Amino acid sequence: MLRKVTVAAVCATRRKLCEAGRELAALWGIETRGRCEDSAAVRPFPILAMPGRNKAKSTCSCPDLQPNGQDLGENSRVARLGADESEEEGRRGSLSNAGDPEIVKSPSDPKQYRYIKLQNGLQALLISDLSNMEGKTGNTTDDEEEEEVEEEEEDDDEDSGAEIEDDDEEGFDDEDEFDDEHDDDLDTEDNELEELEERAEARKKKTTEKQSAAALCVGVGSFADPDDLPGLAHFLEHMVFMGSLKYPDENGFDAFLKKHGGSDNASTDCERTVFQFDVQRKYFKEALDRWAQFFIHPLMIRDAIDREVEAVDSEYQLARPSDANRKEMLFGSLARPGHPMGKFFWGNAETLKHEPKKNNIDTHARLREFWLRYYSAHYMTLVVQSKETLDTLEKWVTEIFSQIPNNGLPRPNFGHLTDPFDTPAFNKLYRVVPIRKIHALTITWALPPQQQHYRVKPLHYISWLVGHEGKGSILSFLRKKCWALALFGGNGETGFEQNSTYSVFSISITLTDEGYEHFYEVAYTVFQYLKMLQKLGPEKRIFEEIQKIEDNEFHYQEQTDPVEYVENMCENMQPYPLQDILTGDQLLFEYKPEVIGEALNQLVPQKANLVLLSGANEGKCDLKEKWFGTQYSIEDIENSWAELWNSNFELNPDLHLPAENKYIATDFTLKAFDCPETEYPVKIVNTPQGCLWYKKDNKFKIPKAYIRFHLISPLIQRSAANVVLFDIFANILTHNLAEPAYEADVAQLEYKLVAGEHGLIIRVKGFNHKLPLLFQLIVDYLAEFNSTPAVFTMITEQLKKTYFNILIKPETLAKDVRLLILEYARWSMIDKYQALMDGLSLESLLSFVKEFKSQLFVEGLVQGNVTSTESMDFLKYVVDKLNFKPLEQEMPVQFQVVELPSGHHLCKVKALNKGDANSEVTVYYQSGTRSLREYTLMELLVMHMEEPCFDFLRTKQTLGYHVYPTCRSTSGILGFSVTVGTQATKYNSEVVDKKIEEFLSSFEEKIENLTEEAFNTQVTALIKLKECEDTHLGEEVDRNWNEVVTQQYLFDRLAHEIEALKSFSKSDLVNWFKAHRGPGSKMLSVHVVGYGKYELEEDGTPSSEDSNSSCEVMQLTYLPTSPLLADCIIPITDIRAFTTTLNLLPYHKIVK
């Protein structure tokens, strides 16, 4: 995949954003997070979706932890082969797990590290994680592993727990892969539960804690693409997976990993390509050997090339409707001719298949040439992490990876191609027409490469100030004028933003309608703030405050998922010396005002590039970017503004540096228990007004706490208008808190407000010392809620854009349609959009909020370094401050679900973005009110299904890039589905539906022929996943909170699921699947159909893409069924009419 990043959280700015700030940003259109599984995540222009991933890191200066040793460089230890290897192990003697003292690590990090360099030049970092093994070292026997499992079982990990989602459980679901414009992530309970589920499922599927993991970074990326084969580096990243000389099966590595509870991924950046995987420890050595063949002797057979080109092309098609990717490609096009920043990194069928064929280029031969030239051992850095001794890991790595060839050629170097954007076209105003409804201004500077200044991190210092949201900040000033909603600035350190040729500094501001009309004034405000910083010069007080905050975070650093960790470390090995491998991208080491000042002084109007993104630009843009079809225009800066900015303009007295931060923790004492220790949360308060669950942490032993409350009200779901008013309320409350709570955020105290389906969710976490101050601030603002007419108008106008932007995405519309059919009394996004368009008043909002606060049931969970007495104070503060009455009767926090009739029902609707060829096809089978045992059996079924589903529908049939089966719990009602993201330019959605049915038929035969050994292996794999220990406290809290927020309270769910798994037989699996696929099966297909030649309009004519065009009227357009499925399906052409005739299933919780 091409690597994507999000801006924010600043990963881009590298300052940590508050949770609420991220939510506002998400709502208003600044991209703040992303996943990178061949996905496009997002960041503010210009680095919106380039290869790169979210590398949000805390930073810290910790001079007392610096090593006395020097960078070992070429003099570092070289692992020797054969007899030398034994000699090396013998030399260490009793220090069999001794790490390298040169490598600086956090005092909280229990792992051991060793650096080696193989004779072929490959550099490797070995990570031995023997924590929680009670002194065990070396290889354990299978019996010892079983003991280890039993010991760890009490931890009751969340990884594969049945996270029952009130909306629907998206287990094994990748449908957010391209959800890179997070402006549409509204704070709703389904998203709260989805977020919990995504975390658990991501760990189960991709980053399961305490799995063994490895990552390898090749120091070459898309910059090395030949001019006549754009996208070749990205294509090669795909092709090496397609079998090797030693293991020729095309899908063999994925199949091996799935069989043993693992996963893999890869990504291509400008100057790096990264591969990573995780797997159960028992199979780690074999997995390493299989994986290493990618780099030793991949087959890359001709037959696979044409099919995998389609996968790359589908990835590109999925990326095309993303404003992030469109802006990135436009920005790259501004580079000097011949500079690699201007290349088309994605690749597609045109560049990798059709054009080469036309020009007699042998793609297969060129692919192999590229591999031979650039996949050389001396360009590679490898990281492996496992519960093995360092000597064992060294032996394995030496034995396996020494086989990777070294061609002896110098690594490609692009450092001489500096100043890529030193062109007349850069310092202009670019108006761009977006896909989404949004107004945004991005100001960008191209600076000399900053990597060499990593010990000072000047751009981090600057971004910390530019992105500040407290008094005196840019955003505070613009918010008071109702011109802006969110601002992010900085450099995300992705390959697109920071490479050997330049570094970017960008400031992206989400504008209101009024702010769009005053965008020049907005830019002027930014320039005034920067001028103020330049006149004052770097401030040591500010630098040391950042150091203090980040020092706290580093010292009490929590562990991360192994696969994420090794991925990050293998990249860190490329630019950083040995002692800084773990810290180079996190810590601030030295205060050098001259370095900061040099970067700061370049941020002047005369060197800035301005991009104005707005639908209002439509009709004014006569240019079109080649690859993504982005409409844009180029203008000189208006004379009056250009003259002002070139003059010695005045400073703005409302802009100033932030005051000293009162939220920085200074007390890190671990508190004593004031009640008996418990394995799971216990209810310590239970009144008619609310209840509180509590668990004191005694496992991770860090001075942090998590506070979560759910304020439940029946008022919200009474009408679509009420749901919208609740969204407005939550977002105005977040807006009101942004400035006063920002200091807490930068002090590593985070909060998030979620407008749930049935109540307001408050989440607060961080160092426990000052956490009560933040919690009380939130509750105070909630109790005294108010809004001005200007803020109300600003938020409601933006909410219209947000709803619109959700609806134009095929994957989110498909989900909305599916849940509208299944969940009774659910208000769809279209209902909400219409209610908002019909008009709501500030008076109606204030009346709604008053009624909401008057009668509630409050449920909370407090975990961490907090006593039970302190925990009860949190609930008491909410009750006393809001002074509400209890609910008259108990209220369910889930919807009722309709019972689908037997048969195959199809709801086929037109996508709402006419410029989008992407279609989404989901085939869903409803099971019903089932037990926990049956849920676990369904999990096992989907785990069996995952790899053959990918192999059949993507690899062999090439139907689309995103292909996945899913376990679903829709308000407690079980089901499973298969989803394919395809394109109307390639396939009719009903062809895809039939192929899904074809796959399920073949899968039935596959599991019938499954051997007992293969069945037991998969059962063991799922058990192992569920037995994995939590990496940090937040994971345990997520799992427990999921039980509380869904009112199921089965805190030992994993133990029950493991017990169920041990009782299953192959016949249980086969019979369950057949029962749901038989004549009485309840099947629902949802098709959201894109625009392209294989799909028809309502009048029967072929549809076509209309770039940059969306339907202004947000309503479902039902499409007729084609003859392909007409004989076997029951069409749904009116959802309300269909569902009103159906029976309702009872409320159901999966607790037995």
From Swiss-Prot:
One of its GO terms (biological process) is positive regulation of myelination. The gene is NRDC. It catalyses: Hydrolysis of polypeptides, preferably at -Xaa-|-Arg-Lys-, and less commonly at -Arg-|-Arg-Xaa-, in which Xaa is not Arg or Lys. This is Nardilysin. It is found in: Mitochondrion; Cell projection, Dendrite. Its cofactor is Zn(2+). Keywords: Cell projection, Hydrolase, Metal-binding, Metalloprotease, Mitochondrion, Phosphoprotein, Protease, Signal, Zinc. One of its GO terms (cellular component) is dendrite. It comes from Pongo abelii (Sumatran orangutan). The keyword Disulfide bond does not apply. The active site is at E237 (proton acceptor). One of its GO terms (molecular function) is metalloendopeptidase activity. InterPro entries: Metalloenz_LuxS/M16, Pept_M16_N, Pept_M16_Zn_BS, Peptidase_M16, Peptidase_M16_C, Peptidase_M16_M. Its EC number is 3.4.24.61. The lineage of its organism: Eukaryota, Metazoa, Chordata, Craniata, Vertebrata. Cleaves peptide substrates on the N-terminus of arginine residues in dibasic pairs. Is a critical activator of BACE1- and ADAM17-mediated pro-neuregulin ectodomain shedding, involved in the positive regulation of axonal maturation and myelination. Required for proper functioning of 2-oxoglutarate dehydrogenase (OGDH). It comes from the Eukaryota. Binds 1 zinc ion per subunit. Belongs to the peptidase M16 family. The modification Phosphoserine is found at S86, S94, S96. Interacts with BACE1 and NRG1.
